[in-house]
Curated annotation (Swiss-Prot):
Main location as per UniProt: membrane
Function: Ice nucleation proteins enable bacteria to nucleate crystallization in supercooled water.
Organism annotation: Enterobacter agglomerans
Gene from which this protein is expressed: iceE
Molecular-function GO term, any one: ice binding
Compositional bias per record (Polar residues), positions renumbered to this chain: 261-286, 311-334, 357-382, 407-430, 453-480
Subcellular location field: Cell outer membrane
Record's comment describing the protein's domains: Contains 126 imperfect repeats of a consensus octapeptide A-G-Y-G-S-T-X-T; further on a 16-residue and a regional 48-residue periodicity is superimposed.
Protein name: Ice nucleation protein
Positions of region (Octapeptide periodicity): 162-1217
Keyword Membrane on entry: yes
Keyword line: Cell outer membrane, Ice nucleation, Membrane, Repeat
InterPro entries: Ice_nucleatn
Note: A structural model is suggested in which the ice nucleation protein displays a symmetry related to that of ice.
């Protein structure tokens, strides 16, 4: 039991504010910051102790909040008002209605010890005595003790305040306040406040506040606040706050806050906050915060924060933070943070951080961090960090760090670190570190370190270290260290050390050491030491030592010693010694001695002697003598003599004679004669003649003739003729002719013809013809023709024709024709034709034709034709045609045709045709046709046709046809036709036809036809027809027809017909017909407005307004207004107003008003008013008023008023009033018909003396 506490009762405003502006909480502590222990209500909190005393300070408004709070008795001060005390702080225990608050005090007072003597402070009066004195007491609280003693309960109290047309249903202790037309239903102890037209349903202990037109459904203990037109549905304990037009659905104990037009769906224990127009969907325990226009979908216990326009999808227990326009998708337990425009996809328990515009895809337990514009893809357990614009792909449990613009691909359990712009590829368990712009490729468990711009490729368990720009390739278990710009290739378990710019190639178990710029190649277990810039090649178990810039090649068990810049090649057991810059090649057991700069090649048991700078090559038992700088190669038993600087190679029994500086190579029985500086190689029994500086290689029985500086290589039976500086290689029985500086390589039975500087390579039975500077490679039975500077590669049975500077690559049986500078790649049986600068890639059996600068990529059996600068990508069995600068992407079996600069993307079996600059996207089996600059997007089985600059979007099985500059959007099974510049939006199964510049919007199953510049909006199942410049708006199942420039608006099930320039507005179930220029307005029970000479026809309860010369027909309770010379007809209770020369006809209880020379007819109880020279006829109990010279006729009990010259006729008990004008004022002459009066049913007039007389018969 509480001994030092008391309960107080007080009221607050609906927003929980007290008279001093302090906001009281719904529960918990409230404190006054300006507390002063003086009497009076100011500078403190106040309340009625135990709920007994004066109720004058309490608010009795229906929306007041009744508060019960607990106060420390030692802090209380009694004030003058009976029962009221003042205190600095309190704890709110209950907030509800008056009844619920009193019930709370009654049920809990027993928990407190009543204080009989209580002082709040020095000089303060006795609180208890103050309570006992009091003025008047609360009626309810006066019975507290009696209620407790009797054990009775409080009666049910419901407060309902509503305006007309509303329906309120409240149960025990509920409060309902609503505007007109609202429907409110409340459970126990609930409070509902809503604007007009709203619908509220609340469970027990709920609070609902909403604007007009809103719909709220709340479980027990819920709180909802929403703007007009909103829809809120909440389960018990939920708290929803939303702007106008929003939709909120919440599970138990959820909190939703959203801007106008938003849509929120939340499971239990969720918290959602979003800007206007956003969409949020969350499972239980989620927390979502998003900007306007965003879309959030979250699993249980997730937290999402995103900027405007973003899209977030999260599994349970995920956290996402993203900038505007971003897209995030995550499985449970993930944490994503990304800048605007980014895309993040994460598996379970992953963490992603990325800058704007980045793309991240991660498996479970991954951590990705990337700068803007980067792309990261990782399997589970990976850790990636990369700069902007980088690309990272990682296997499970990998770690990647890279600078901007880098590309990383890693297997599982790998670690990669790279500078910007680098490329790294590694298998599992690898560790790569590289500078910017480097390329690293590593096998399992390898370690790579490289400077910027380097290239490293390593097998498993390798260790590579290289400076910038180096290239290293190693098998497993190798250790490579190289300076910048070096190239290293190593077999397993090798050790290589090289200076910068060196090249090393080693077999297993080798040790290579080289200076910078050197080249070393060694087989297993070799030991090579060379200076910088040297080249070494060694067999097994060899030892090579060479100075810088030397070249050494040794077989096993050889010993080579050479000065710097020398070249040595030796077989087993050889001993070579040469001066610097020399070249030595030795067979087994040979001995070679040469001066500096010499070249020697010897078979076994040979003896070579040469001056400095000479080259000698000899088979067994040969004797070679050459001058300085010469080169000699001899078969067995050969004898070679050459001048200084010459090169000779001879088979056995050969005779070689060469001038200084020449090179001769001959098989047995050959005879070679060459000028100075020439090179000749001949098969047996060959004859070679060459000018100075030429190079000739021939098989047996060959004839070679070459100009100075040329190179010729031929198999047996060949005939080669080439100009100076050319290179020719020919198979057997081939014929080659080439200009100066060309390179030709041909298999047997080939014929090659090439201009100067060209390169030709051909297999058997090929025919190649190319211009100067070209490169050609051909399979068997191929035919290639190419201009200067081109590159051609062809499989067998291919035909390639290319302009200068082009590149062609083709498999067997292909036919390629391209312009200069183009690039073509073709599969078997393909045909490619392309202009200059184009790029073509085709699968087998494809046909590609492209203009200059275009890019084409196609799978098998495709047919592509594009203009210059275009890009085409096609699946198999596709046909693409596009103008210059276009981009085409097609699935299999598609047909695409596009003008220049267009973009086309299509799934399989599609047919697209578009003009230049257009953009088309189509699902499978679609047909699209569009003019230049148009944009088309279609789902499957759709047909779209559009003029230039148009935009079309359609779902499946739609048919759209639109002129240039138009915009069309259609649901499935729709048909749209529109002129240029039009805008069309249609639901499914709709048919829209519109002229240029028109705007049409329709729900499903509608039919719209409109002229140019028109605007049409239709509900479902409607039919609209309009001329140009018209505006039509209709509800569902309406039929509207209008001429040009007209405006029609109708509700559901209406029929409107109007001429040009008309304006018709109608409610549901209306029928309006008007001529041109008319203005009709009709609602349900209709209202029409039309111009002159109009015809209006409407049903009951209608209002018609028309100009002169109009014809109006309406049912009962209608209002008709028209100009002069009109005809009006209405049913009972009609109101007719017309100008002069009009005819009005109406039923009973009608009111008719017309101008001069009019004819008015009405039923009983009617009122007729007309001008001069009119005829008025009415039934019983009617009132007729007319001007001069009129005829008034009515039934019994009627009142007739006429002026000078008028004739009045009425039935029994009627009143006739003649208004007589004497020049100064009117005088009324009154007569009654029937008993005591004049005779009824007789026509009366006034004579000159103002007497009532019978009208004489005419």
């Amino acid at each position: 039991m509480k001994e030092d506490k008391v309960l107080i009762l007080r009221t607050c405003a609906n927003n929980m504010a007290d008279h001093g502006g302090i906001i009281w909480p719904l529960s918990g502590i409230v404190e006054c910051k300006y507390w002063k222990p003086v009497k009076g209500f100011e500078n403190g909190l106040t309340g009625l102790i135990w709920g007994k005393g004066s109720d004058s300070p309490l608010s009795l408004h229906a929306d007041a909040r009744w508060v019960v709070a607990e106060v420390d008795a030692d802090e209380c001060i009694a004030i003058e008002t009976h029962g009221w005390i003042k205190f600095p702080r309190a704890e709110v225990l209950h907030v509800g209605t008056k009844t619920s608050a009193m019930q709370f005090i009654l049920h809990h007072r027993a928990d407190y010890v009543a204080c009989t003597e209580m002082q709040a402070g020095p000089g303060s009066p006795d609180v208890t005595s103050e309570v006992k004195v009091g003025n008047r007491s609360l009626p309810v609280t006066d019975d507290i003790d009696a209620t407790i003693e009797s054990g009775s309960t409080q009666p049910t109290q419901t407060i309902e305040i509503a305006t007309y047309g509303s329906t309120l249903s409240g149960t025990h202790q509920s409060q309902l306040i609503a505007g007109y037309g609202s429907t409110e239903t409340a459970g126990d102890s609930s409070t509902l406040i809503a604007g007009y037209g709203s619908t509220g349903t609340a469970g027990a202990d709920s609070t609902l506040v909403a604007g007009y037109g809103s719909t709220q459904t709340a479980g027990e203990e819920s709180s909802q606040m929403a703007g007009y037109g909103s829809t809120q549905t909440g389960m018990k304990g939920s708290d929803l706050t939303a702007g106008y037009g929003s939709t909120g659905t919440a599970g138990d104990d959820s909190s939703l806050i959203a801007g106008y037009g938003s849509t929120q769906t939340a499971g239990e224990d969720s918290s959602l906050t979003a800007g206007y127009g956003s969409t949020q969907t969350a499972q239980k325990g989620s927390d979502l915060t998003a900007g306007y226009g965003s879309t959030g979908t979250a699993g249980a216990d997730s937290s999402l924060i995103a900027g405007y326009g973003s899209t977030q999808t999260a599994g349970e227990e995920s956290t996402q933070t993203a900038g505007y326009g971003s897209t995030q998708t995550a499985q449970k337990g993930s944490d994503l943070t990304a800048g605007y425009g980014s895309t993040g996809t994460a598996g379970d328990d992953s963490s992603l951080i990325a800058g704007y515009g980045s793309t991240q895809t991660a498996g479970e337990d991954s951590s990705l961090t990337a700068g803007y514009g980067s792309t990261q893809t990782a399997q589970k357990g990976s850790d990636l960090t990369a700069g902007y614009g980088s690309t990272g792909t990682a296997g499970a449990d990998s770690s990647l760090i890279a600078g901007y613009g880098s590309t990383q691909t890693a297997g599982e359990e790998s670690t990669q670190t790279a500078g910007y712009g680098s490329t790294q590829t590694a298998q599992k368990g690898s560790d790569l570190t590289a500078g910017y712009g480097s390329t690293g490729t590593a096998g399992d468990d390898s370690s790579l370190i490289a400077g910027y711009g380097s290239t490293q490729t390593a097998g498993e368990d390798s260790s590579l270290t290289a400076g910038y720009g180096s290239t290293q390739t190693a098998q497993k278990g190798s250790d490579l260290t190289a300076g910048y710009g070096s190239t290293s290739t190593a077999g397993y378990e090798s050790s290589l050390i090289a200076g910068y710019g060196s090249t090393q190639t080693a077999g297993y178990g080798s040790t290579l050491t080289a200076g910078y710029g050197s080249t070393q190649t060694a087989q297993n277990e070799s030991d090579l030491i060379t200076g910088y810039g040297s080249t070494s090649t060694a067999g097994a178990n060899s030892s090579l030592i060479a100075g810088y810039g030397s070249t050494q090649t040794a077989s096993y068990n050889s010993v080579l010693t050479a000065g710097y810049g020398s070249t040595q090649t030796a077989r087993e057991g050889s001993d070579l010694t040469a001066g610097y810059g020399s070249t030595g090649t030795a067979g087994s057991d040979s001995s070679i001695i040469a001066g500096y700069g010499s070249t020697q090649t010897a078979s076994y048991h040979s003896s070579l002697t040469a001056g400095y700078g000479s080259t000698q090559t000899a088979r067994e038992q040969s004797v070679l003598t050459t001058g300085y700088g010469s080169t000699s190669t001899a078969g067995a038993d050969s004898s070679l003599i050459a001048g200084y600087g010459s090169t000779q190679t001879a088979g056995y029994n050969s005779i070689l004679t060469a001038g200084y500086g020449s090179t001769q190579t001959a098989q047995e029985g050959s005879d070679l004669t060459a000028g100075y500086g020439s090179t000749s190689t001949a098969g047996a029994d060959s004859s070679l003649i060459a000018g100075y500086g030429s190079t000739q290689t021939a098989g047996y029985n060959s004839i070679l003739t070459a100009g100075y500086g040329s190179t010729q290589t031929a198999q047996e039976g060949s005939d080669l003729t080439s100009g100076y500086g050319s290179t020719s290689t020919a198979g057997a029985d081939s014929s080659l002719i080439a200009g100066y500086g060309s390179t030709q390589t041909a298999s047997y039975h080939s014929s090659l013809t090439a201009g100067y500087g060209s390169t030709q390579t051909a297999r058997e039975q090929s025919v190649l013809t190319t211009g100067y500077g070209s490169t050609s490679t051909a399979g068997a039975d191929s035919s290639l023709i190419a201009g200067y500077g081109s590159t051609q590669t062809a499989g067998y049975h291919s035909i390639l024709t290319a302009g200068y500077g082009s590149t062609q690559t083709a498999q067997e049986r292909s036919d390629l024709t391209t312009g200069y500078g183009s690039t073509s790649t073709a599969g078997a049986d393909s045909s490619l034709i392309a202009g200059y600068g184009s790029t073509q890639t085709a699968g087998y059996n494809s046909i590609l034709t492209a203009g200059y600068g275009s890019t084409q990529t196609a799978q098998e059996n495709s047919d592509l034709t594009t203009g210059y600068g275009s890009t085409s990508t096609a699946g198999y069995d596709s046909s693409l045609i596009a103008g210059y600068g276009s981009t085409q992407t097609a699935g299999y079996n598609s047909i695409l045709t596009a003008g220049y600069g267009s973009t086309q993307t299509a799934q399989e079996n599609s047919d697209l045709t578009t003009g230049y600059g257009s953009t088309s996207t189509a699902g499978y089996e679609s047909s699209l046709i569009a003019g230049y600059g148009s944009t088309q997007t279609a789902s499957f089985k759709s047909t779209l046709m559009a003029g230039y600059g148009s935009s079309q979007t359609a779902r499946e099985q739609s048919s759209l046809t639109a002129g240039y500059g138009s915009t069309s959007m259609a649901g499935y099974d729709s048909s749209l036709i529109a002129g240029y510049g039009s805008t069309q939006t249609a639901g499914y199964q709709s048919t829209l036809t519109a002229g240029y510049g028109s705007t049409q919007t329709a729900e499903h199953s509608s039919t719209l036809t409109a002229g140019y510049g028109s605007t049409a909006t239709a509900g479902a199942d409607s039919s609209l027809i309009a001329g140009y410049g018209s505006s039509l708006t209709s509800g569902i199942r309406s039929f509207l027809t209008a001429g040009y420039g007209s405006t029609l608006i109708s509700g559901l099930r209406s029929v409107l017909t109007a001429g040009y320039g008309s304006s018709l507005i109608s409610g549901r179930r209306s029928s309006l017909t008007a001529g041109y220029g008319s203005n009709q307005i009709a609602s349900h029970r209709s209202s029409l407005i039309a111009g002159p000479e109009s015809t209006q026809i409407t049903g009951n309860r209608s209002m018609l307004i028309a100009g002169k010369g109009s014809s109006q027909t309406a049912g009962y309770r209608s209002t008709l207004i028209s100009g002069a010379d009109s005809v009006q007809m209405a049913g009972e209770r009609g109101k007719l107003i017309a100008g002069a020369d009009s005819t009005q006809t109406a039923g009973d209880r009608s009111k008719l008003l017309a101008g001069n020379n009019s004819y008015l007819t009405a039923g009983d109880r009617s009122k007729l008013t007309a001008g001069n020279d009119c005829i008025l006829m009415a039934g019983d109990r009617s009132k007729l008023t007319a001007g001069i010279n009129s005829i008034l006729t009515a039934g019994c009990r009627s009142k007739l008023i006429g002026s000078n010259g008028s004739t009045l006729t009425a039935g029994e008990n009627s009143v006739l009033i003649f208004r007589c004008w004497d020049g100064k004022r009117y005088t009324n002459v009154v007569a009654k018909t029937g008993k005591g009066g004049i005779e009824a049913d007789m026509p009366y007039q006034m004579d000159e003396d103002n007497n009532i007389v019978n009208k004489p018969e005419e």
